[in-house]
């Protein structure tokens, strides 16, 4: 199982120069991939990772996740291929539907028919990434045309899929799923088998799809303090239906329970267990604000990285 970390590009807490310095430090420590979140009020992840990837050539990038509703498939294909044209074949393109409170409340875009929207989006995006011409006239999304962007490596596409229908799309059409706030039992009993079954049902191999599990992590002796901090920082996810469903399915009382917290042996055992349950890549979000705790956490993750 690959071990990665989230690369923070929040402009409120770090300048662009400092973000790039932080990325270089992560690469020097031996990590081979970072994942970038995309919040609706933060810097554009693709732009940031393209600039940073030019400066730091030793590391790959994943996006977790770019919202589909605010960019047409042709625009996203242009942006993703441009990124790989600049930094080489290092982009892993994670997409998602965001959340109703964001799409309708902030953007004024309907959240209705999410499964149909996802399929129609991929009908346009995937062929364009492969350099093919598209003629897709959907009820929600129409994509017609082609790009003049040849000889550029095609980025693997992942979906933020948690429910069975979205996992079916991810398994049959993409490189896999990126999960968040999803515990070990749910990964073992729901996410991994549903994704792999969809791949096989589409005539693919189970190994053609990957489960990327993103969770908060902290190596610390102050377990209660870290758990309280996680509960405070990630409280909003208890109010988002897709994540609340995963927390409830696991039997968690809230987002704090999803965090992996403890000393080195405790955290290492929980992360290794994810690999035994079929997770292909663990992505740690280092949420503790104490620099020593963050360094200790990254030091452990380095020992787990193959």
Language model: regions and residue ranges:
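Active-site-adjacent structural elements that line small-molecule/cofactor binding pockets in enzymes
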Residues: 1-306
């Amino acid at each position: 199982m690959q071990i990665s970390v989230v690369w923070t590009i929040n402009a409120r807490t770090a300048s662009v120069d400092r973000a790039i310095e932080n990325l270089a430090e992560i690469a020097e420590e031996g990590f081979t991939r970072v994942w970038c979140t995309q919040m609706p009020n933060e810097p554009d992840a693709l732009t940031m990772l393209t600039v940073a990837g030019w400066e730091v050539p030793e590391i790959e990038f994943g996006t977790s996740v770019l919202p589909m509703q605010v960019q047409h498939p042709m625009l996203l294909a242009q942006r993703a291929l441009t990124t790989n044209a600049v930094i080489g074949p290092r982009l892993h393109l994670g997409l998602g539907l965001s959340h109703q409170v964001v799409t309708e409340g902030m953007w004024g875009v309907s959240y209705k028919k999410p499964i149909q929207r996802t399929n129609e989006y991929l009908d346009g995006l995937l062929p364009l990434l492969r350099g093919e011409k598209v003629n897709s006239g959907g009820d929600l999304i129409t994509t017609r045309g082609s790009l003049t962007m040849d000889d550029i490596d095609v980025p693997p596409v992942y979906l933020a899929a948690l429910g069975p229908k979205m996992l079916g799309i991810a398994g049959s059409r993409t490189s896999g799923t990126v999960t968040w706030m999803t515990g070990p039992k749910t990964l073992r009993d729901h996410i991994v088998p549903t994704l792999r079954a969809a791949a096989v049902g589409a005539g693919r191999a189970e190994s053609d799809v990957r489960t990327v599990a993103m969770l908060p992590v902290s190596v610390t002796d102050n377990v209660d303090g870290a758990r309280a901090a996680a509960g405070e920082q990630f409280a909003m996810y208890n109010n988002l239906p897709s994540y609340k469903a995963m927390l409830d399915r696991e039997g968690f009382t809230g987002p704090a329970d999803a965090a992996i917290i403890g000393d080195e042996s405790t955290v290492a055992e929980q992360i290794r267990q994810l690999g035994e349950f079929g997770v292909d890549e663990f992505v740690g979000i280092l949420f503790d604000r104490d620099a020593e705790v963050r360094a200790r956490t990254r030091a452990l993750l380095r020992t787990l990285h193959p």
